[in-house]
Regions:
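C-terminal catalytic domain of photolyase/cryptochrome flavoproteins
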Residues: 1-146
Length: 146
């Protein structure tokens, strides 16, 4: 859920992770800055190391909340809306006007991100990021016996 929210904010709404990260962090009961920031950056696609993850909010809602029980609990205005309508976002007349078309905005983000990744310097820059910040196995040092 966290990954999808960050992905949607970054790709579909094209918001900078630095602004959305603190808003999301406020909702966590298990907030750990060292984990949160790196995950936010990864889900926002700014590291260049990981493949972009642009989630389908429709697929995620169907997979994670097939009966829409959680969605209806979080958004009480949807309590009497049919589950099928909730999962395909046909809510314009029932709840609110969409601020972005999820399918079109995901396609635009995907096209934009992949165009950037095709840049001739992308791999070089991504490698530099990895060498500076990427996770690596720690070397095992043999302890001298006393």
């Amino acid at each position: 859920m966290r990954a999808m929210i960050m992905s949607f904010a970054s790709y579909n709404l094209w918001q900078p992770w630095q602004k959305t990260s603190p808003l999301l962090a406020e909702l966590f009961t298990d907030f750990e800055p060292g984990i949160h920031i790196s995950q936010v950056q990864m889900q926002s696609g700014v590291t260049g190391i990981n493949l972009p993850r642009i989630y389908s909010v429709f697929k995620q809602s169907l997979d994670q909340d097939p009966t829409a029980e959680w969605t209806k609990k979080i958004i009480p205005q949807l309590e009497n809306v049919e589950t099928d309508l909730i999962h395909n976002a046909e809510l314009r007349d029932l709840y609110f006007e969409q601020i972005v078309d999820p399918k079109l905005s995901a396609k635009k983000a995907r096209d934009t991100i992949w165009a950037m990744r095709k840049n001739k310097d992308f791999k070089k820059i991504a490698r530099e990021v990895y060498l500076k910040h990427g996770s690596r196995r720690r070397q095992q040092f043999n302890r001298a016996s006393n």
